[in-house]
Amino acid sequence: HTGRYGREFKVSLTDIMKRILKEVPQLYRLRISSIEVTELDDDFITFMKEEPRIARHLHIPLQSGCDSVLQRMHRPYTTQEYYEKIEKIREEIPDVSISCDLIVGFPQETEKEFEETYAFLQKCRFSFLHVFPYSLRNGTVAADMPCQIDPQIKKQRAQKCIALSGKLYDTYQTQWIGKEADVIVEQCKEEGSKGHSSQYFPVTIA
């Protein structure tokens, strides 16, 4: 839980980020790899909005877009709470890119529940998805649940969401046609220089 870092010392992630950027002024960009939606407080959002060196990308695990599945997963939020949070972030930081983790085929996930998730993914307008078919882990509560999903069904659901991720990515990329992006160059080759934008999409400079 990245967002909980420092709590045992009574400091917040935002406090730590501020200190890093203050003590390392030459640091050009700071990106948070992944953070839970419940850990994105107003202080974090405001700091990200006001500090241009914070990458305009947030990877916020969702896991499921269906409330009944989230309850079985013991996730501490609802789809409505998740949606309201990412919309608040977009309102404050219009050029932000938001991606998520998704697990399909969690035990007892019905076709209707999966379709709810699929519709929610479209509603959220993510820039891309990290999709994982549920994998049984011995010793976990989920492993002992009845109605484990057939591997072929899990594969089909994962493929459908991966295809959606491609469409979402293309849509997001299209929004940047004709616009300037702030890119950190990571490789220089004959075919062009390559790097990532602040929104964490790859860029080739020919």
Predicted features along the sequence, with ranges:
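Conserved SAM/AdoMet-binding glycine-rich loop
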Residues: 1-111, 122
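Structural beta-strand/beta-sheet cores of well-ordered domains, especially the beta-sheet scaffolds
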Residues: 28-31, 56-58, 96, 127-130, ...
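Thr-Gly-centered strand-to-loop micro-motif
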Residues: 35, 72, 129, 205-206
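Hydrophobic, well-ordered secondary-structure elements that form the walls
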Residues: 60, 101, 121, 129, ...
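Short, small-residue-rich loop/turn micro-motifs
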Residues: 61-66, 133-138, 197-199
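C-terminal, non-catalytic macromolecule-binding modules
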Residues: 112, 116-161
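Terminal RNA-binding accessory module
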Residues: 144-206
